[in-house]
Amino acid sequence: MHKNKLPKYFLFVDKYEKNILKNNIINLGIIYRNYLKKQNENDIFKLRSYCNKKKIKFYISNNLKLAIKFKSHGIYIPSFNKRITLNKKNLTKNFAIIGSAHNQMEIKKKIDQGCEAIFLSPLFKVKKNKKYLGVCKFNLLTLKYKNKFFALGGIRKQNINILKILNIYGMAGISYLKKNRPKNLGRFL
């Protein structure tokens, strides 16, 4: 059976912008998540069209109906959503279920929700959160599970090389990937 291949990089966006990226990142997925206001279907349509044109995989956060309506490649379940449990049998075979977690308890919840990949964050120090995992704790959390893990949180030019020693499938970002094309990832490019 053909398994849906996930991108190595993910970019989180909350609205459509004409030039979302200042670079051409190969093997990229875009996750639309907008928690501040009602989801704008016009923005979703424009993002989906942009992704189709650029051959970028497109995912929608927290709304299965919209993900199916706009034929996204999958759904992203944020760490705060503890209710959704999806049955892969009811979805198309290439539909991916991905989620995010901050600790072991949330990782287990995402696995129970059917997530094949998990964004684990924050890896490094970020402005909005004083707590972060760090390299050792991050690796200890990921080694216990067979799921694919993505590094998220605080990734910058100064610490990008550290990703090479992590037990990860790829990385995700909000601002770093918009501005930079990661050049120093070795096995990830």
PLM segments and residue spans:
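N-terminal amphipathic alpha-helix/helix-capping segment at the start of soluble metabolic enzymes
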Residues: 1-19, 189
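Hydrophobic faces of well-ordered beta-strands that scaffold small-molecule active sites
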Residues: 7-13, 28-32, 58-60, 75-77, ...
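Short, acidic/polar
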Residues: 11-24, 62-65, 102-109, 156-161
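N-terminal active-site wall of soluble small-molecule enzyme domains
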Residues: 18-19, 29-90
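Conserved, mostly hydrophobic/aromatic
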Residues: 30, 67, 110, 118, ...
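Alpha-helix-loop-beta-strand connector modules within alpha/beta enzyme cores
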Residues: 43-59, 82, 87-103, 131-156, ...
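Glycine-rich phosphate-binding active-site loops on the catalytic face of alpha/beta enzymes
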Residues: 75-86, 119-131, 155-189
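Internal catalytic-core helix/loop-beta-alpha segment
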Residues: 94-124
